[in-house]
Amino acid sequence: MKLNYSLLTILIFTLFSCENENSDSNELDPAEEVQIELGKTNQTIEHNGITRTYVQYVPNSYNHENPTPLVINFHGNGGDAQAYADSTGDFYQFHNVSESGKFIVVYPQGVIRVKGAAEWDPGDNSSTNINDNDLFFTEKLIENIDKTYNIDLTKVYAVGFSNGGMMAYGLACKRPTKIAAIGIMS
């Protein structure tokens, strides 16, 4: 009987030792902590050797403890992400609404293509040229933002103006598990 108590004591000690080692597993190592930036900032991301830019707005109400929805707002053909984010009017400035709606909004920059204007290419699922396919870029953008912020991946929305609306449609049709809903402004 004494042997059983000794084994039980060793087992309990081992279990508590394991728990203590792993109890902080969800906390970031201070050396690995990421900088949370609130408000409107300009960001970059590398995608297939190309530096892509986007404007990001994180509301002051952001709380890393709570999963947060993400809205991706695509500009139209010939547009500019910075100018689009700064535009005024009823259909613009999603970042103002994000304060009360408690969501993060990003305005990615399209790529200058054949026509000499920044545009979106929703591509084709069978396309092997992922440099010309903004579906892959958008997936990487979502993953990149989720590494820094606590994104609710079931609440990622796409909205777009004109060619940006076509991009939102492309995401809804070709990446339905990544996008919860879309909105088209023109």
Where are these regions (language model features)?
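Short glycine-/acidic-enriched loop or helix-start segments at secondary-structure transitions
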Residues: Q82-Y84, G116-A117, A168
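A domain-start/cap signature at the N-terminus of enzymes
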Residues: C18-L70, D90-Y92, V97, G101-F103, ...
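Cap/lid segment of the alpha/beta-hydrolase catalytic domain
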Residues: Y107-N133
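Alpha/beta-hydrolase active-site loop
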Residues: S126-Y149
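Bacterial Sec-dependent N-terminal signal peptides
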Residues: M1-L28
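The serine-hydrolase catalytic nucleophile loop
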Residues: A81-Q93
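Active-site glycine-rich loops that stabilize anionic/oxyanionic intermediates
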Residues: T68, H75-G79
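Active-site nucleophile loop of the alpha/beta-hydrolase fold
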Residues: G110, G183-S186
